[in-house]
Amino acid sequence: MSSLLLSDVLSYGIFGFSALCVQAHLTSKFTPSFSRNLEEKLPLHNKAVFWWLGISDSALRYVFVSINIAVCVLLWSPELRSFGLKFTLGLLGVGFYSDMKLGESPIPHLLLVSTVGAAILVR
């Protein structure tokens, strides 16, 4: 397997996870426990990291949905994929910071950072 193909496969995995996040933020029909976790944690992350935006929790949810849609578009397009991976890595850094500030487990964001980092490294 070539390194570019490996990077593309990892990118599609992150694309799929971002699409799952969009779905989980909008409805709990397919992922009830993931949706519930996002709904419970969103107000905490809003207070810990995004307080300076001064927006409601529901508005922040749609900001996250928009960001995840943007990540999907960037990772789907071969021309934009390299930028999309770097953009995603930056966003995951914010998520990791938020986890640390709230005393949450950093493992989910670290796994995603590792996957994105590997996709960037082999590209």
Curated annotation (Swiss-Prot):
Keywords annotated in UniProt: Isomerase, Membrane, Signal, Transmembrane, Transmembrane helix
Keyword Transcription regulation: no
Described function: Cyclic ether formation enzyme; part of the gene cluster that mediates the biosynthesis of xenoacremones such as xenoacremone A, a compound that shows inhibitory activity toward the PI3K/AKT signaling pathway and which has the ability to induce apoptosis of A549 lung cancer cells. Within the pathway, cooperation of the hybrid PKS-NRPS xenE and the trans-acting enoyl reductase xenG is responsible for the formation of the reduced tyrosine-nonaketide derivative. The alpha/beta hydrolase xenA then accelerates intramolecular nucleophilic attack to give a pyrrolidone derivative.
Localization (cell): Membrane
Pathway linked to the protein: Mycotoxin biosynthesis
Family: Belongs to the cyclic ether formation enzyme xenC family.
Phenotypic effect of disruption: Abolishes the production of xenoacremones A and B.
Membrane-topology annotation of the record: Multi-pass membrane protein
Protein name: Cyclic ether formation enzyme xenC
One GO cellular component, as annotated: membrane
Extent of the signal sequence: 1-24
Organism (species): Xenoacremonium sinensis
Enzyme Commission number(s): 5.-.-.-
